[in-house]
């Protein structure tokens, strides 16, 4: 075994931990189908949200980690449950009244409310695929509608009929009495209306491959379970799909956890082997509620990318997948700055094992670009934007160029993008909420001390020396907690509760400019 393999197999980075579980489940052998299958799922009832991207990004991290550990070929499929009946109309789509007329219809049988594709389901699928394509995910797209209608699942559906009683014995104890009386794993597609029916099944015939139900008029209707004439309920569907496609690895949100045992048991009943599974925690909105495609109560993919590079979004997905995290606009600056820190550490690190533990290794699948920001962070640019209120990024570059003459927009495109992002973020989230603290007499003494200090130092004074001088002024002012001191300065000078390290900020903004800012508050 190579040293690289040794470092990878010993790594505690979660993608490697998951990859080792897959390798162990295979006993190091190539599956009969010739590859290891990774599957992600998508419910196209509403527009894809950032959690959809997150599942695919995380899945690829595990896939690439597995490829470090083994030369067994891999494949990733993204499976869309687009044959599901519409149960709820999303609030964030055009013409919701039109869509409401198609309740219980398969998503691929509803007209496209956006007017671009052959159906509502096709539009939602296209939105997901365009994003996955844009960011270089290598995957095969599977449509539930196509799989059912093309007969890909026919053999398994016949087996569900053959194992009907066994599956019902598994499922019925999980329901209330009222639901037990009507439940069946099969949902016929109504020959007249095209709706996905949740009706009691009066008769099932494995040899004929049919089920029989009563329509509203009391007539017995017999339909094949094959060829797209029936769809399985979502819990049996999950397990059937694992067995039919021979899935080796799947991850799903915590909302699936209670049913994961059922998925696995149904897979076994149908002769399959359940995949290795990872349950990740759900994202929460600003109020601590689960984010939802139908509500649109979170950041969209496009929203994040309006204010920050995609790498910062990937870092958010990488961090602690089994811990619930609040996902709203205020998490963006922190993730950008953490990405910058991890990137710099990666390129300074010579120990390969430590590189494997660095999130950027998994974000970039081992091919980590080197970025240079000269110590300028996103947060620092936001604060610079806050004091100079620029109309465009050229104003920020005026300060950046003085701070670091070697930096230019052409030679440092990452920093150039950050400047543009910072202005957008400031205008949309900070500017309207600035609230300045009117300085007290005590504050004015402090501000005068800062002004005197700035008048005494040279322009080339190092940031740490300036930071220490600011710190010493706070100590002299008699604050019990220096956090309160810095908070007062941020509120007086920036109109914010939080802010930068003043030493670095003053170096970037300029001593003379800082003097003007302080004088303006005296």
Curated annotation (Swiss-Prot):
TM segment ranges: none
Record-listed E.C. numbers: 6.1.1.6
Residue ranges of the motif 'KMSKS' region: 290-294
Residue span of motif 'HIGH' region: 44-52
GO biological process: lysyl-tRNA aminoacylation
Annotated binding of ATP, by residue: 293
Record's catalysed reaction(s): tRNA(Lys) + L-lysine + ATP = L-lysyl-tRNA(Lys) + AMP + diphosphate
Keyword entries, A-Z: Aminoacyl-tRNA synthetase, ATP-binding, Cytoplasm, Ligase, Nucleotide-binding, Protein biosynthesis
Record GO cellular component, one term: cytoplasm
Compartments reported by the entry: Cytoplasm
Statement: the UniProt record of this protein carries the keyword ATP-binding: yes
HAMAP family: Lys_tRNA_synth_class1
Protein name: Lysine--tRNA ligase
Organism per entry: Rickettsia conorii (strain ATCC VR-613 / Malish 7)
